[in-house]
Design a protein with these regions (language model features):
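Hydrophobic (often cysteine-bearing) scaffold residues that line and stabilize catalytic clefts
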Residues: 96, 100, 104, 152, ...
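A residue-level signal for conserved active-site and pocket-lining positions in enzyme catalytic cores
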Residues: 78, 104-108, 199, 231, ...
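C-terminal, charged and often intrinsically disordered regions of DNA end-processing helicases
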Residues: 1-99
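Charged, terminal alpha-helix-loop-beta segments
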Residues: 143-144, 155-173, 177-183, 247, ...
Length: 318
């Protein structure tokens, strides 16, 4: 097993261990974050959540107030749209390029998991159908049915190949975990912040430093880095040990990696505290602000919202 202070190198074909090696070589070892500093961050987040809950009345039926990772991104776009999404209002049906963008993101998560647990995906489209059927993901299967077979194969085959080239032969010493949950319970259980981490490598039980990895099928966007920082925060508070780095991987590109310093942790905590306060207010009944953008195209409120954007600007889903 590689030493924790050395880049791990496995005997791997193609790029294999090179993917992790490239991340690792770009992450300068940060000053370790003391457990007491993590405890302090948790206490500050808890105090902020308690304060937010004390300023408003939240009905018992709306407890606990849930703040998943997706809520941060939704609120950064539009409060009214975030409420519509959270209350399980069916969004507008996505078609064409938008549907393919969503499918790429769904497929990427499944393909990376398959690569790390069972090996290479050989036939992308049949494999994805099988994976979605196995977990009874009818919504994604319906989305898949909305595009032609040729469109789906053209979009998915290169994705599966890129996953195999980049993730094949990963040193098992890293003990990769996919789609793992990290939750933070605040204000005596009244607020729950959570996220699902795409890939975790290393960590307390492995003898290796921890690395948190987000995989993204679309183009790099500023909010992606903030999402990765949030995951690093949640994992640190879950495990009591901070990962040393976060990375974002986009198929066909070199990974973007950042060491996890205390400053990174504090910035993520401040953003989470602000978002929690905003969401608590909205759940309690505050009128949401409206911020039009390309997301109006799939917002269920667009027919009723006076601020809804009506042009035909499109955006691929990350």
């Amino acid at each position: 097993m590689p030493a924790p202070d050395d880049p791990p190198h496995g005997d791997a074909p193609s790029q294999s261990g090179q993917l992790v090696d490239r991340w690792w070589s770009r992450i300068a070892a940060p000053t370790p974050i003391a457990p007491a500093e993590l405890v302090e961050l948790r206490e500050e987040l808890d105090a902020a959540a308690v304060a937010a809950m004390s300023r408003v009345h939240v009905d018992a039926d709306d407890l606990p107030v849930r703040v998943p990772k997706s809520r941060l991104a939704d609120l950064a776009r539009c409060e009214r749209s975030a409420l519509a999404s959270a209350w399980s209002v069916d969004p507008r049906r996505r078609e064409g390029a938008e549907a393919l963008g969503l499918l790429r993101g769904i497929a990427l998560d499944h393909f990376v998991t398959h690569q790390l647990t069972e090996g290479r995906v050989l036939e992308a489209l049949p494999a994805l159908v099988s994976m979605l059927t196995a977990v009874a993901d009818d919504e994604s299967l319906e989305l898949l049915d909305s595009v032609s077979i040729d469109e789906a194969e053209t979009a998915l085959a290169p994705l599966a190949a890129s996953v195999a080239d980049s993730w094949g032969g990963l040193d098992p010493a890293w003990m990769p975990r996919t789609q793992s949950r990290a939750s933070l319970v605040l204000a005596g259980g009244a607020v729950i912040c959570s996220g699902v981490v795409d890939v975790e490598l290393g960590g307390p039980t492995t003898g290796l430093p921890g690395v948190v990895i987000e995989v993204k099928s679309g183009r790099p966007a500023p909010e992606h880095q903030a999402e990765a920082y949030l995951y690093a925060l949640l994992v640190a508070l879950r495990d009591g040990v901070a990962p040393v780095g976060v990375a974002r991987w986009y198929p066909g590109s070199d990974p973007a990696s950042t060491p996890v310093t205390l400053g990174v942790r504090e910035a993520a905590a401040a953003r989470l505290a602000d978002t929690t306060a905003t969401w608590v207010e909205l759940v309690a009944g505050r009128t949401p602000e409206e911020s039009p953008g390309v997301w109006c195209r799939w917002c269920a409120e667009s027919d009723r919202c006076p601020s809804a954007r009506t042009d035909d600007v499109r955006e691929s889903h990350p």
